[in-house]
Amino acid sequence: MATEHLPAERAQSLLSAPRREEEPQKPNYALRLTLAGHSAAISSVKFSPNGEWLASSAADALIIIWGAYDGNCKKTLYGHSLEISDVAWSSDSSRLVSASDDKTLKVWDMRSGKCLKTLKGHSDFVFCCDFNPPSNLIVSGSFDESVKIWEVKTGKCLKTLSAHSDPISAVNFNCNGSLIVSGSYDGLCRIWDAASGQCLRTLADEGNPPVSFVKFSPNGKYILTATLDNTLKLWDYSRGRCLKTYTGHKNEKYCLFASFSVTGRKWVVSGSEDNMVYIWNLQTKEIVQRLQGHTDVVISAACHPTKNIIASAALENDKTIKVWSSDC
């Protein structure tokens, strides 16, 4: 019966009646591109903040810059002497920093493809790196168990934080650059004041499983951690409380990159040691999609800054990057 034929009171009650909640929509990521160019295991993939490019690093000591939409190889950056574990973009997408087993970081100019600075000071493999939002500072983490803060302009180390008692697995600045989070094989996740270098808080899990990845949420209020017991957790770090736990994937050996997808609905995205990409609903913790196609461990998964696009990369038996897109 059409609403307009009902008595006014009845029609109004129908219009204002609370609706049953709709089923949460799920993503429908499908494979769009497969990018091949590295000759060894890929370690990291990152979209540029302007969304135009995708940077990949690998055990072949190379960085390749790809077109984010067409998958074409734009540039190859040469300079490191040993494998590269991580890359990170400056906020304006004009520069890139890389972390290598040769114990150095390199800052690259995107336009020319040339190395602008080599940052020396770590005494062991440099495993992770990040620019702060103004892109005047770089943070790095190393197997020497320290976190270092560098000045981009001069290439000088400004601070060395005796951060952990085991290798550092991940470092990340928050959205305004005031905080740094570090994760380590010692099982601790630490939040630092970027200006003073003071440790503000330490997060630890029961049993202290090695922390293999850490990242601030886009709004800076939460931290996503991965541990080598097949678990991702979302923390309210100001209270030291774990809010959400995401499981179902496999992660016991490698430091797998995870990411927040916020361009459509809100997902958590991670690689997995069963050769798949896993996508969880951020709120419900439900696995909403698994992306199949890689033939080795998916070490890295990155989300495009403005579109529903995921890039994933895999280890030695695969050596490819796959680009996936979804309607939501």
From Swiss-Prot:
WD repeats lie at residues 37-76, 79-120, 122-162, 163-202, 206-247, 250-290, 293-328. A motif (DDB1-binding motif) lies at residues 186-190. The keyword Repeat applies. Residues 1-25 are annotated as: Disordered. It comes from the Eukaryota. Keywords: Repeat, Ubl conjugation pathway, WD repeat. SMART domains: WD40 (SM00320). Probable part of a cullin-RING E3 protein ligase complex containing CUL4B-DDB1 and a substrate-recruiting component (DCAF). Interacts with CUL4B and DDB1. This is WD repeat-containing protein 5B.
